[in-house]
From Swiss-Prot:
Belongs to the ATPase alpha/beta chains family. It comes from Protochlamydia amoebophila (strain UWE25). Disulfide bonds: none annotated. Produces ATP from ADP in the presence of a proton gradient across the membrane. The V-type beta chain is a regulatory subunit. This is V-type ATP synthase beta chain. Keywords: ATP synthesis, Hydrogen ion transport, Ion transport, Transport. One of its GO terms (molecular function) is proton-transporting ATP synthase activity, rotational mechanism. It holds the Pfam family ATP-synt_ab. The lineage of its organism: Bacteria, Pseudomonadati, Chlamydiota, Chlamydiia, Parachlamydiales. One of its GO terms (biological process) is proton motive force-driven plasma membrane ATP synthesis. Gene3D superfamilies: 3.40.50.12240. CDD domains: V_A-ATPase_B.
Amino acid sequence: MKIVYDRINNMRGNLITITAEGVSLGELARIDLKDGRNIYASVLRIDGDQVTLQVFQTTRGISTSDQVTFLNRQMQAVYGDTLLGRRLSGTGLPIDGGPQVIGESIDIGSTSFNPVKRIVPRDMVRTNIPMIDVFNCLVKSQKIPIFSVPGEPYNALLMRIANQTDADVVIIGGMGLTFKEYQAFIENAETAGTINKTVMFIHRATDPAVECLLVPDMALACAERFATDGKNVLVLLTDMTAFADAIKEIAITMDQVPSNRGYPGSLYSDLASRYEKAVSIEDSGSITVIGVTTMPGDDVTHPVPDNTGYITEGQFYLHHGKIDPFGSLSRLKQLVIGKVTRDDHGDLANAMIRLYAESKKARERQAMGFKLSKWDEKLLTYSHLFEERMMNLEVNYTLEEALDLGWETLAECFLASEVGIKESVISKYWPEIAQISK
């Protein structure tokens, strides 16, 4: 039997407080309004018999005499094949004008996957973006952020990854999206023809902050079920800074003592519990997580990117519309380079980055008016070709095509003896291009 409480003691923002007993943290409750509407909330804090709930929509229209019924279960998402191609809110309700999703109800916010059933990552997630596939490979079950400043095309990068990836299912979790950004994701999926393998959980900027907190949990709960059913799932989250700001907003409303720049002390755990859902499951599928983290003022010491860096396995830095090869790092790339990719992959990638770093110095000498040597001229030519062919996010090359293009670029600019690659690799892969004016 469910006990009905008919007295709300306090309302602050999206939080309400009632006197109740026998409830658990995270338990779902239904608020029955006088006008016949039902609003849902979940238990956020328990202090003796004082229970604080966060309302998923808005407290507007709620009176202190409305009835509150605890449902003896956690917040749930609906999982099933009918989920593919759908757009849902942070609470799991359809926002695409379609019918209710039919399927199995699954709890959200559960613990990470059983470590005993995890396996060491050994497969690559292909994105057909050279700056990722060639230089910082994305590995199945990897968790990695995209560090960026507001205004950079990070959502466009996520869309291109979603379009070009070889993952079986793509789940997009949008937090704090403007209407324009939301529409861009919809139009991209429809235009690229990936809508039938895509699921979107969307929190728009005008939606309550409480719903923002649910988006990653909804996305990752469904991803976990797809993965246990043998699917390789790619989860794209944007923007985790908006998620952290929603946590801060709720914490301030609850009068919690802030830890760093207004964020609560639980920020690290809140982020880690989401990113740790990334997994490769033995004899089954995988979950790979890419999360956009915007850095206010391009400050990497901001609490959100700072904490994220300790949790994740590398990062992609997005600067001036390109993935920065010097700030970006994939800590798992050594698990696949030369093992599941071509044997020239590691040598070629290292040589190209080293020469591009040297070309930066040549550009500085050119900018300061120094006389340039013939080697400097070669480096400047190479720098232009590298940025045009490898750093352009609009390209769509398979890994093998990108590696071949890398060899062609080196051969157009340098002699084989100048690139610093061992002779056994050079003799096998150096293209037959006439050595003119080198």
